[in-house]
């Protein structure tokens, strides 16, 4: 009997363009396949053994005759291609309308109100890469003390500040002000604190980022599990994505490997329920920066930890590895891409070689997890428990 699911989201590790990718400017995007082509092949032996290369239409990864895990891929039903939309959908919340984006920066009324409430002028207010904007405006920020506000193709309001100019506590308070403002017809998916350090135009972002999300619009997989008196243990930015709704405990992480370490720490306890992990380096450090070599290395590093994860699994555990969207580092765009997400599952009770094929919605993951944990629910989605269980 399954009593715990370990769900690991490899942030942005897409498995090829979705049929509507052209509507999002993402025709030809294929995060895994194009990275593999760019670096002369990916070496992911443990995910390959589980069936990664057996997923229908996946490119650049070896197929095996007898996978030890279940495998497949899922379509995004929601309108959008960002972190919040992807994680919410896999947890049972489908967005009929995309969250607001601000391709020309934020309107004057929003900025004026924000400046008044925080007692500081802001600089920036445009679409920008986070690493580029601190290079461009970091010196001015240090001279003036004005926080840097910027956005991207996603539904985000980002505030960058030097940790010695605006201390972390104050930066987080500033972001909470923005979060309270950006609702209703101004809604953004996330307000993100982006602290950095350094001097003289040589700045680097720190791992003290914080995401301030919205409450999910409907009840999620997490809330159903928590209400069932079970544990929802979140690693990385998961608790921020769900605005703590349905979370019983959480830990933030410094990088992917720290995320694996923290996941293992939860696995070594006897706590039943869900361990929900997001590993963001793929997206943040390599996808958005169009660095296929760095991305490939990060994938190979993660694959190198899978044996350790498997060794620490209990008989009642099921491991699931998936993604939330794409972010193909080989295309001109530095933004997310509208892609299928891969899915592999492993455990004592999982049928090796089980193919879930192409599912109609990420929400099938959440529905299946609740089914495995025997939690009654009204979640959208279709469970594939019967396909993957022995």
From Swiss-Prot:
Q: Which GO terms describe its biological process?
A: 2-deoxyribose 1-phosphate catabolic process; 5-phosphoribose 1-diphosphate biosynthetic process; metabolic compound salvage; nucleotide metabolic process
Gene Ontology MF terms in the entry: magnesium ion binding; manganese ion binding; phosphopentomutase activity
Q: How is the cofactor bound?
A: Binds 2 manganese ions.
Please state the protein's primary subcellular location.
Answer: cytoplasm
Q: List cofactor names only.
A: Mn(2+)
Pfam families noted in UniProt:
Metalloenzyme (PF01676)
> What is the native source organism of this protein?
Clostridium acetobutylicum (strain ATCC 824 / DSM 792 / JCM 1419 / IAM 19013 / LMG 5710 / NBRC 13948 / NRRL B-527 / VKM B-1787 / 2291 / W)
Show the GO cellular component annotation of the record.
cytosol
List the protein's name: Phosphopentomutase
Could you read off the lineage of the organism from its UniProt record?
Bacteria, Bacillati, Bacillota, Clostridia, Eubacteriales
Note the HAMAP family from the entry: Phosphopentomut
Cite the binding residues for Mn(2+) 1: 11, 324-325
């Amino acid at each position: 009997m399954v009593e715990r699911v370990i769900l690991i989201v490899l942030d942005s590790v897409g498995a090829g363009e979705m049929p509507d990718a052209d509507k999002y400017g993402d025709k030809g995007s294929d995060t895994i396949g194009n990275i593999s082509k760019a670096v002369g092949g990916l070496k992911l032996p443990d995910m390959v053994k589980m069936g990664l290369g057996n997923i229908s239409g996946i490119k650049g990864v070896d197929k095996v005759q007898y996978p030890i895990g279940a495998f497949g891929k899922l379509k995004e039903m929601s309108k959008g291609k960002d972190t919040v939309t992807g994680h919410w959908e896999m947890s049972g919340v489908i967005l009929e309308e995309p969250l607001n984006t601000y391709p020309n920066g934020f309107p004057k009324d929003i900025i004026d109100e924000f400046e008044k409430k925080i007692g500081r002028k802001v600089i920036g207010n445009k679409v920008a890469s986070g690493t580029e904007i601190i290079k461009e405006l970091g010196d001015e920020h240090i001279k003036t003390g004005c926080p840097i506000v910027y956005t991207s193709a996603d539904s985000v309001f980002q505030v960058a500040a030097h940790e010695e100019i605006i201390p972390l506590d104050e930066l987080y308070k500033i972001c909470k002000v923005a979060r309270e403002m950006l609702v209703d017809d101004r809604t953004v998916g996330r307000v993100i604190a982006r602290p950095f350090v350094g001097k003289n135009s040589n700045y680097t972002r720190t791992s003290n980022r914080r995401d301030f999300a919205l409450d999910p619009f409907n009840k999620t997989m997490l809330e159903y599990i928590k209400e069932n008196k079970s544990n929802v243990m979140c690693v990385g930015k998961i608790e921020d994505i769900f605005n703590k709704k349905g979370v019983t405990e959480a830990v933030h992480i410094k990088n992917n490997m720290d995320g694996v370490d923290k996941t293992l720490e939860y696995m070594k306890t006897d706590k039943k329920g869900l361990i929900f992990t997001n590993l963001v380096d793929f997206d943040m450090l390599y996808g958005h920066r169009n660095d296929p070599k760095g991305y490939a290395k990060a994938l190979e590093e993660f694959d190198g930890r899978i044996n350790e994860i498997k060794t620490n699994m209990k008989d009642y555990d099921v491991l699931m590895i998936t993604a939330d969207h794409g972010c193909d580092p080989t295309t001109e765009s530095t933004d997310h891409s509208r892609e299928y997400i891969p899915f592999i599952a492993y455990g004592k009770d999982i049928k090796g070689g089980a193919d879930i094929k192409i599912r109609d919605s990420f929400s099938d993951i959440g529905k299946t997890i609740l089914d495995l944990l025997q939690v009654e629910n009204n979640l959208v989605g279709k469970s594939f428990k019967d396909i993957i269980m022995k």
